[in-house]
């Protein structure tokens, strides 16, 4: 059984026809986009890929931030190329916002998506695993399903492994 078949079987009772994937430039983006494409019904489905630039309160919300915009557009182009392998309609969008979590939830409402897919890196904060601030906000406030795709735990160096 392929990964696609196993994934589809898990959500078979509730077909997903539209998914919002949030990309950030992390290595987990590609896996998140592929996962979302595999969840979608291939006929008449829509994939929304969203890259958000968080704008500091010291700047106007519509400030032109050329380096961030260029990076976001490059990431969106890469993710669109990945989604072309799958047979779903893809829409990519770059959005400027003060708070990413709020913007993601609002986009999910505006687009009436069936699910949100977030790819998150494995990260630690103060020695403990952390999923950051955005994922908990989305899990709490999104009106639809939310799937988290976390990267594997990075291998520890032999020095760290032998001291614990």
Question: Could you say what each language-model-derived stretch is?
Answer:
Residues 8-66, 82-84, 88:
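Small/aliphatic-rich secondary-structure junction motif
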Residues 64-74:
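A short acidic, glycine-rich active-site loop
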Residues 51, 119-121, 150-151:
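Short secondary-structure boundary segments
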Residues 118-141, 155-159:
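Glycine-rich, Arg-bearing micro-motifs that act as flexible, cationic patches
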Residues 1-10, 14, 85-116, 153-158, ...:
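Structural beta-alpha unit
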Residues 17, 114, 143:
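Conserved acidic residues
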Residues 48-50, 91-95, 147:
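General small-molecule cofactor/ligand-binding pocket signal
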Residues 37, 80, 105, 136:
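Active-site phosphate/pyrophosphate- and oxyanion-stabilizing loops and adjacent acidic/basic residues
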């Amino acid at each position: 059984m392929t990964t696609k078949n196993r994934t589809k079987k898990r959500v078979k009772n509730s077909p997903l026809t539209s998914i919002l994937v949030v990309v950030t430039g992390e290595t987990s983006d590609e896996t998140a986009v592929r996962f979302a494409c595999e969840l979608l019904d291939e006929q008449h489905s829509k994939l929304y890929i969203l890259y958000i630039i968080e704008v500091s309160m010291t700047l106007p919300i519509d400030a032109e931030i050329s380096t961030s915009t260029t990076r976001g557009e490059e990431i969106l182009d890469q993710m669109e190329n990945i989604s072309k392998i799958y047979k779903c309609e893809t829409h990519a969008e770059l959005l400027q916002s003060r708070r990413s979590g709020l913007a993601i939830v609002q986009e999910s409402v505006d687009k009436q998506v069936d699910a949100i897919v977030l790819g998150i890196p494995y990260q630690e904060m103060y020695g403990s695993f952390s999923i950051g601030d955005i994922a908990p906000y989305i899990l709490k406030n999104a009106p639809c399903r939310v799937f988290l795709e976390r990267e594997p735990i990075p291998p520890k160096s032999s020095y760290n492994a032998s001291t614990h």
